[in-house]
């Protein structure tokens, strides 16, 4: 179920304050954040946010196309390594 329209999008309070402060100054710098559940709002467009994936901060440049998505969508937490190709041959020999 999606979030109620009357509540508005969830954005971490400190993250929003940092972005508003940078917008007032007209500065662009990388902002580190652990708030993966925050929704991307139009005020964030043009900024680079370093989103934590559990190991490192992954830089995400915010564009108009990303508005409405969550920050965590762009910082994958799991690293898939392909399945072993010769696994059947190894099992037959045992």
UniProtKB/Swiss-Prot annotation:
A UniProt-annotated Pfam family: Ribosomal_S19
Listed GO CC annotations: chloroplast; mitochondrial small ribosomal subunit
Superkingdom of the source species: Eukaryota
Record localization: Plastid, Chloroplast
Main localization (coarse): plastid
Biological processes annotated in GO: ribosomal small subunit assembly; translation
Keywords: Chloroplast, Plastid, Ribonucleoprotein, Ribosomal protein, RNA-binding, rRNA-binding
Gene Ontology MF term list: rRNA binding; structural constituent of ribosome
PANTHER family associated with the record: RIBOSOMAL PROTEIN S19P FAMILY MEMBER (PTHR11880), SMALL RIBOSOMAL SUBUNIT PROTEIN US19M (PTHR11880:SF8)
Function: Protein S19 forms a complex with S13 that binds strongly to the 16S ribosomal RNA.
Record family assignment: Belongs to the universal ribosomal protein uS19 family.
NCBIfam families attached to this UniProt entry: rpsS_bact
Official protein name in the record: Small ribosomal subunit protein uS19c
Gene, per the UniProt record: rps19
């Amino acid at each position: 179920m999606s979030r109620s329209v009357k509540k508005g999008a969830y954005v971490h309070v400190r993250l929003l304050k940092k972005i508003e402060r940078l917008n007032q100054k007209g500065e662009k710098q990388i902002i580190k954040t652990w708030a993966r559940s925050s929704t991307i709002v139009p005020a964030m467009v043009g900024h680079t946010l370093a989103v934590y994936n559990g190991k490192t901060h992954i830089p995400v440049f915010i564009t108009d196309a990303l508005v409405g998505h969550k920050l965590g969508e762009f910082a994958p937490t799991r690293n898939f390594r392909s399945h072993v190709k010769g696994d059947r041959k190894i099992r037959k020999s045992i």
